């Protein structure tokens, strides 16, 4: 029988919140209460539903020791998503860890816009550039099971997560291809009904100013060059011509990049170019369409 601790789960959670608020360096954890609870969930099996019923139960000592070890990792600035080993994207959990970009809620808008468009083309071919964990490609593929989705990713570390998530979600209609999106391998051949990407778009000079948790993510998934636009420029010379007639090119962008990226798409001959704003009113995506067949 596990050795009982001296306190209750309620007290242990309070201790976790206190540690993250007081001992995280160089600044306190902004989401101390949330992170403390997520880490307690991981070690105890408690959740938001059963915690109110069990908060006054005594915890096993082994759970406390494991919990404190996870808290110490979080206190050094390690992202809570890496500690948990998974994170939610549009209702599915994706395996993540060091070496891969963490799925973010704002990226869900890209996946939703792509799915809305592709529902009219159920037997579609889709290409995702800079596939990372596979959260976009797999979400599209699972929502549209008749789709044929290819995810292109350069990083060997990220490819491991991509393949693990394909297996986890039984995404048999996704193909993972390792290669450079700026110099795609010969297997990447159009026409595609949609080409999607959340590429690196942070200006190189801004990387040192990012939150310390973000700085733990791979630089190659963040660094977009001097002005953050290197990947969009490089893609512009390659991918618009891989679109099927009427096909969609859809990017995630930084808040100040909408007009510049929209201009690139227009210069590539795409039509109906538009900037999509997120729920906070900030530019979040740019899209354009290949001309329809006459």
Name these PLM-found stretches.
Residues 1-48, 52:
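Non-catalytic accessory regions of SAM-dependent methyltransferases
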Residues 20, 118, 166, 239, ...:
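Conserved hydrophobic residues forming the short capping helix/wall of the S-adenosyl-L-methionine
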Residues 39, 77, 107, 136, ...:
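Residue-level signal for inorganic ion chemistry
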Residues 40-116:
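Conserved AdoMet
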Residues 84, 178-179, 253, 277:
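Short loop/edge segments at beta-strand edges and connector loops
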Residues 106-208:
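Conserved SAM/SAH cofactor-binding pocket of Class I
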Residues 226-289:
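Conserved Class I SAM-dependent methyltransferase catalytic core
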């Amino acid at each position: 029988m596990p050795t009982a601790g001296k306190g209750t789960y309620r007290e242990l959670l309070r201790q976790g919140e206190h540690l993250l608020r007081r001992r995280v360096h160089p600044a306190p954890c902004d989401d101390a209460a949330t992170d403390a609870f997520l880490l307690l969930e991981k070690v105890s099996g408690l959740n938001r539903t059963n915690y109110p019923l069990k908060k006054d139960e005594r915890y096993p000592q082994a759970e406390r020791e494991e919990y404190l070890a996870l808290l110490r990792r979080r206190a050094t600035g390690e992202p809570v998503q890496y500690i948990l080993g998974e994170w939610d994207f549009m209702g599915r959990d994706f395996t993540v860890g060091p070496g891969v970009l963490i799925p973010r809620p704002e990226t869900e808008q890209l996946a939703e816009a792509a799915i809305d468009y592709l529902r009219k083309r159920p037997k579609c071919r889709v290409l995702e550039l800079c596939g990372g964990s596979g959260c976009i490609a797999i979400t599209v593929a699972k929502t549209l099971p008749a789709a044929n989705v290819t995810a292109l990713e350069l990083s060997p570390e990220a490819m491991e997560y991509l393949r693990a998530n394909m297996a986890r979600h039984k995404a048999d209609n996704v193909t993972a291809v390792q290669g450079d999106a700026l110099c795609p391998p010969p297997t990447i051949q159009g026409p595609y009904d949609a080409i999607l990407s959340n590429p690196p778009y942070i200006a190189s000079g801004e990387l040192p100013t990012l939150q310390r948790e973000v700085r733990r993510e791979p630089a190659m998934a963040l660094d977009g060059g001097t002005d953050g636009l290197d990947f969009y420029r490089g893609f512009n010379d390659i991918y618009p011509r891989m679109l099927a007639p009427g096909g969609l090119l859809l990017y995630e962008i930084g808040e100040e990049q909408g007009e510049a990226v929209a201009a690139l798409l227009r210069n590539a001959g795409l039509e109906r170019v538009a900037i999509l704003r997120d729920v906070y009113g900030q530019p979040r995506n740019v899209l354009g369409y290949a001309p329809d067949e006459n």
